[in-house]
């Protein structure tokens, strides 16, 4: 059985369950303790052995892309101020971003519509689909468990 190496994270929804917070901030970017929900999800996917990630976004979700991108001015400021721990955190997040591709869903029409935007990315390869606001924390990542079950059966 072929190993699962691709993940599709769906992050194009309106975030109506967390209004009014999601009116100005994408729900995936709302913090859980000290980092955005979507970062927990990307970390889980990477820790599960997934090497290629596609995040399906919609209009007004640029913050997600920005979060996983480099920010040289911030990095320089952190180094100049001797804040090496924060510098490492910022660089680690940008490193995760190297595995991420983004696609913009033009019309929000449900899960199936969002997954269709991943067609070219996944091709005929096995992949996992994860909602951009479903955070499951555990010693053994949920995504890894699902991949093992797929590979076994």
Which residue stretches match the model-derived regions?
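Short, flexible hinge/linker loops that cap or flank conserved catalytic cores
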Residues: 1-2, 94
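Residue-level detector of functional hotspots within protein domains
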Residues: 4, 15-21, 39, 86-88, ...
């Amino acid at each position: 059985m072929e190993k699962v190496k691709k993940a599709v994270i769906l992050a194009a929804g309106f975030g109506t369950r967390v209004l009014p917070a999601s009116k100005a901030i994408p729900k995936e970017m709302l913090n859980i303790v000290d980092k955005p929900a979507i970062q927990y999800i990307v970390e889980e996917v990477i820790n599960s052995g997934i090497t290629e990630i596609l995040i399906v976004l919609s209009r007004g979700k640029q913050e997600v892309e920005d979060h996983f991108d480099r920010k040289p001015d911030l990095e320089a400021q952190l180094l100049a101020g001797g804040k090496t721990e924060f510098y490492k955190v910022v660089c680690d997040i940008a490193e995760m971003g190297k595995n991420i591709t983004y696609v913009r869903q033009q019309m929000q029409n449900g899960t199936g519509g969002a997954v269709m935007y991943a067609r070219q990315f996944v091709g005929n390869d096995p992949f996992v689909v994860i909602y951009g606001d479903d955070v499951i924390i555990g010693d053994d990542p949920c995504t890894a468990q699902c991949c093992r079950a797929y590979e076994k059966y």
